[in-house]
Amino acid sequence: MLFDYFKQGINLGGFLSQYEIVTDANSEDVLIQHFETFITEENIAQIAAWGFDHVRIPVDGFLFFDQKAGRLCDKPLEYLDRCINWCARYGINVVIDLHNIEGHIFGEMDTPTPLMTSPVLRDDFCLFWLRMAEHFKEYDKTKLMFELFNEIADATGYLWNSLYKRAIKEIRKIDITRWILAGTNYVNSVGYLDRLDLVDDPYVFYNFHYYEPNVFTHQNAHFSEEFCIYKSAQAYPGDMTDYIRFLNEHDHFRKEHPLMNSETTCNDKELMQTLLADADKFVNYSGCELYCGEFGVIDTAPTDDALKWIRDFVTLCNSLKIGHAMWNYKCLDFEIIDINNQVVRPEILALLQELNR
């Protein structure tokens, strides 16, 4: 069911979330110009022409939710509605992904975050989704799906299970058939699927992100402390023994990669199959459908190797009937087009078009 409508997508990161990375968020005029021009109808038409069937739109809770008033903010909602209307015009389905909200701390797995522990922030999280359900109640469930949160970090291992189920109950007060995605702990790790408490709801699906191993997909990432230190070029397929040695010598980085261990000696399709076996088991044993909301390779990786990795991942996902959305369409270091709407990774675009056929 899910795979039929959300098979091959691409992310619109940088539009309504992480916009501060691509524009001056301190200038109201500049920010308005960004929202008006970063994603246009022409961009959506292009995405459709490339053969994608959906987009994932990250939205920022700081931008969209007025905590004092307990309501969604009009202007950001207007930008989102406009984009969704363009998508409908070109036959593109939509995932609305709550990418960030007050109280969340990305990757914080040592201490419970305020989002997990504060009653006020937990209430706000659930109220955000209640308001979204109210706003989009009449929209076709097969055309628009809610993703409860982007990459959750819950040091307790159980508070997220409680919070996400509560958010679903709020949505169901308004819309009993809206399709909903609930992601795994530890920044949507595929290895944490077995720690999700599942709900008895035919319209709730589960999702993960896949960038394994990060040393390949994020190599030389300027935004990563780890990969500003470890700068060794990584191939696919490629040897990983030196990187595993590095992790063993840097415990604060080691704990950020729970799926990597001393036996992870080679970055290849076999490793990918091993890690995705958790997804395969989840689908087979739970009877629930899965979706991968993000995957991709940074633009500093060797192009030929990035092509091999992407081909292997998409092929494996398709064989498991797991829909997927590549990160990212525009800007943010993983892009297909740049800020000027010029294609900057033509080889990867050509591969995606081939895989989309």
Model-predicted segments: where are they?
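Acidic/histidine-rich helix-loop elements
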Residues: 13-39, 68-72, 110, 114-119, ...
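Catalytic domains of carbohydrate-active enzymes, especially glycoside hydrolases
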Residues: 38-60, 278-285, 314-316, 320-325
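An active-site-proximal structural segment forming one wall of the substrate-binding cleft
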Residues: 34-55, 65, 69-100, 107-145, ...
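Aromatic-rich peripheral "rim/lid" segments of glycoside hydrolase catalytic domains that contact
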Residues: 301-357
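Short, solvent-exposed turn/loop segments enriched in Gly/Ser/Thr/Pro and often Arg
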Residues: 58-60, 98-105, 184-186, 325-333
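N-terminal carbohydrate-binding accessory modules
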Residues: 1-54, 282
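Acidic-and-aromatic substrate-binding clefts and catalytic sites of carbohydrate-active enzymes
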Residues: 33-38, 63-65, 71-74, 152-158, ...
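Active-site region of glycoside hydrolase catalytic domains
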Residues: 3-6, 116-266, 273-298, 315, ...
